[in-house]
Design a protein with these regions (language model features):
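The feature captures the beta-strand-to-loop junction immediately N-terminal to the Walker
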Residues: 36-38
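Helix-to-loop junction immediately C-terminal to a conserved catalytic motif
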Residues: 51
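ABC ATPase NBD coupling module
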Residues: 67-80, 109, 183
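Conserved ABC ATPase "signature" region
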Residues: 110-128
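ABC ATPase C-loop
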Residues: 125, 149-150
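Conserved signature/switch motifs of ABC ATPase nucleotide-binding domains
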Residues: 131, 152, 184
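Conserved ABC ATPase signature
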Residues: 132-136, 140
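Catalytic Walker B motif of ABC-type/P-loop ATPase nucleotide-binding domains
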Residues: 157-160
């Protein structure tokens, strides 16, 4: 399993001011790191940099001490991102969205079928496996995106506000599943504005006013 490090990074979207300055954080195997802050504080920006979607304006993002390249490079290293907007293909079924992703990252069709079923079941989605994404509710879509991320079994799992549309029972279940990923050995980074969800994590990094402050180092 791998260690993710952000080293003194300034992060800015193209042509814009830095959203975050001088961020340093490490997420190691077996732990869940909560990244908290209000809307617009930079949670998605930080996870985008960790996922290889946003090159730092300065500083570095490292996987096991080696510089992280673009998103393709991150995927090849086992960095899985569950995006805030779910990123699902509306014209595919829930099961197809997951199976396609597993096969695209090297899984066999048989393995994809097995992992898909194993990921959908604990999220209460077995009955929706063959429904199109556009037919699912917002909460069901969010859970499908989570299932896809879990099915990929990454070394690093980045979860961006993945409980925002879920009720209390499903939020608790998702946190249990993230904990299971950490127990498997993954480094899990969970961006959330939910204090209860953050409290269930091992450490908490809070973003505010362009800076990152440790609440629980």
């Amino acid at each position: 399993m791998k260690t993710l490090t952000v080293d003194d990074a300034d992060l800015a979207w193209e042509g814009g001011r830095p959203v975050l300055k001088g961020v340093s954080v490490t997420a190691g195997p077996g732990e869940i790191l909560a990244v908290t802050g209000t809307s617009g504080a930079g949670k998605t920006t930080l996870l985008s940099a960790m996922a290889g979607l946003l090159p730092p304006a300065s500083g570095r993002v490292l996987i096991d001490g080696s510089p992280l390249g673009d998103r393709d490079h991150a995927v090849s290293l086992g960095v899985v991102l569950i995006p805030q907007d779910n990123g699902l293909a509306a014209i595919l079924t829930a099961a197809e969205n997951i199976s396609v992703a597993v096969i695209a990252t090297g899984g066999t069709p048989a393995e994809a079928r097995r992992r898909t079923a194993e990921a959908l079941d604990p999220l209460g989605l077995s009955g929706q496996a063959n429904q199109l994404i556009e037919e699912l509710s917002g909460g069901q879509q969010q859970r499908t995106a989570i299932a896809r991320g879990l099915a990929l079994r990454g070394d690093v799992l980045l979860a961006d506000e993945v409980t925002s549309e879920l009720d209390a029972a499903n939020r608790e279940r998702v946190i249990e599943l993230l904990r299971a990923e950490a127990t498997r050995g993954a480094a899990v980074v969970f961006a959330t504005h939910d204090p209860e969800a953050a409290a269930a994590c091992d450490r908490e990094l809070h973003l505010a006013d362009g800076s990152a402050l440790w609440v629980r180092p």
